[in-house]
Amino acid sequence: MKKVIINTWHSFVNIPNVVGPDVEKEITRMENGACSSFSGDDDDSASMFEESETENPHARDSFRSNTHGSGQPSQREQYLPGAIALFNVNNSSNKEQEPKEKKKKKKEKKSKPDDKNENKKDPEKKKKKEKDKDKKKKEEKGKDKKEEEKKEVVVIDPSGNTYYNWLFCITLPVMYNWTMIIARACFDELQSDYLEYWLAFDYLSDVVYLLDMFVRTRTGYLEQGLLVKEERKLIDKYKSTFQFKLDVLSVIPTDLLYIKFGWNYPEIRLNRLLRISRMFEFFQRTETRTNYPNIFRISNLVMYIIIIIHWNACVYFSISKAIGFGNDTWVYPDVNDPDFGRLARKYVYSLYWSTLTLTTIGETPPPVRDSEYFFVVADFLIGVLIFATIVGNIGSMISNMNAARAEFQARIDAIKQYMHFRNVSKDMEKRVIKWFDYLWTNKKTVDEREVLKYLPDKLRAEIAINVHLDTLKKVRIFADCEAGLLVELVLKLQPQVYSPGDYICKKGDIGREMYIIKEGKLAVVADDGITQFVVLSDGSYFGEISILNIKGSKAGNRRTANIKSIGYSDLFCLSKDDLMEALTEYPDAKGMLEEKGKQILMKDGLLDINIANAGSDPKDLEEKVTRMESSVDLLQTRFARILAEYESMQQKLKQRLTKVEKFLKPLIDTEFSAIEGSGTESGPTDSTQD
């Protein structure tokens, strides 16, 4: 007989009633598969449960023996150790906090009667605390703003005028050092006689060098299209460049060596020459800014040549001093001679010798010593390079300056040959040549589209707006149009020049363009071409109604007057096709322009109202149908061409496949035969083995 132990609630004598339900709930949750730890609210129950376990272990064992079936542990027994472990962990932390919690409870009990009085004062205290917090936040924000204001740094835009002006300031001391340091080192009198001035200029240039390094740390640069203004980034960017190392070397205080060697050694300041890149940068920016770049390039080249000749003259004088003045015919003459003892004569003679040598003219005394020969050979090589540079650069500059004239002259020559070949009258030839002369003298030979085609669309539109928009707004029908349409039309305006006596349009001509007078005078003349009715001047326009092709116009699409140029006239032309192309994107503007055109025709009595209100014109429908037919024909031809290409490609592919088959067939046959042969050979061997 198996004994079945039935545990009742009375078996757990030492377990308080408060703990039982909570523990049972947690155990049932764990049986159902819920993996959750006990919350902080269950810490007390866990500790009480642990105490009951320690006091009555028999009850714990009897509780565990409560199974669903005999001989097998229940799910409660499986999960209970984990639950008890969790209870122990929580209990250990709770035991440490028990004395503190007891003290807090005592304080709370004591402070309960006081809290009733303080609850009344709580709103006032809360308000005061909130006000104090707001004040602190405002003070912190004010401090942050002040700190941000302090951190804000004035950044120089490298493309602005301030940076360009500073480049000019730093170029002056650089050029001073490059010209005077070598001269003072070679000509002792120049250094000793004007020592005070040189020292003042030297240290002033050093101050400018230091300021230039500071300016470099405040010069912005573009990062993702935006100018960087953070001080730390600017400094790090400058330090990471190779120029920073050169700048540091150029401001090393080598003047301290004056204490050891004396004031007659200005060559100790040669490290100041390392700042030459700033001079090159200034010249480069000036070349892009000036309106006369070719002249600036020539003058810049001449300056470089003069500096090279100056340095060569100083080196020649120093070599003569090292060998001895007057020791041979090649060196500088004896300085004891009054004619050659002056400082001005020393420099001029050396400069003259250097110029003759570097320009390969010669006519100088021949060298005597080996060192003199080496120096003259080096000078001749440098002179050849300088001469080639001069000829090449000046030749290219002159060709660039005359490129426009040469191209224009080529056009005139081609037209002259054509008129001579076609036997054009002499009067017509004179008119054509005068027209070309007018274009050249008034600098109207530039093709605007050719010049502006390299610019982005937005920049090109802005230039066209600045040049033509005011002129286009003078036209009545375009006065109230939206800005987008005006920009489209401005880009389509074409400049035209007419010579005296040229007809812009004649009565009865089909109107395909409208004209706006930019400069010059036009006359509305009779059929005889002499009688003038009206003179049109700058800002006038005509032909705007004809390009709208308004239905019901009695004049149709033809010109109603003869307009002739009195002198040379500059006009802007807007074609009908360009206008209609622009109006396709602006249908509302098209309707508004047609209404304005109808009002103008009604005022002049040139509008047939019945036809205008008759609805759509069948001619327009016919035009649309013809356009559709032409587009369909175009598509058919394209489809036929594509189909023919497809068929030809198929034929070529088939031919290639047949060639490949012919090539591979013998190879495949040989391989199959080899396989069959190997199979027959292996058969008898297998049988013998068996």
Curated annotation (Swiss-Prot):
The gene is CNGA1. Residues 33-76, 88-151 are annotated as: Disordered. Keywords: Calcium, Calcium channel, Calcium transport, cAMP, cAMP-binding, Cell membrane, cGMP, cGMP-binding, Coiled coil, Glycoprotein, Ion channel, Ion transport, Ligand-gated ion channel, Membrane, Nucleotide-binding, Sensory transduction, Sodium, Sodium channel, Sodium transport, Transmembrane, Transmembrane helix, Transport, Vision. Residues 186-195, 252-264, 316-342 are extracellular. Signal peptide: none annotated. Glycans are attached at N327. Residues 64-76 have a biased composition (Polar residues). This is Cyclic nucleotide-gated channel alpha-1. Its main location: membrane.
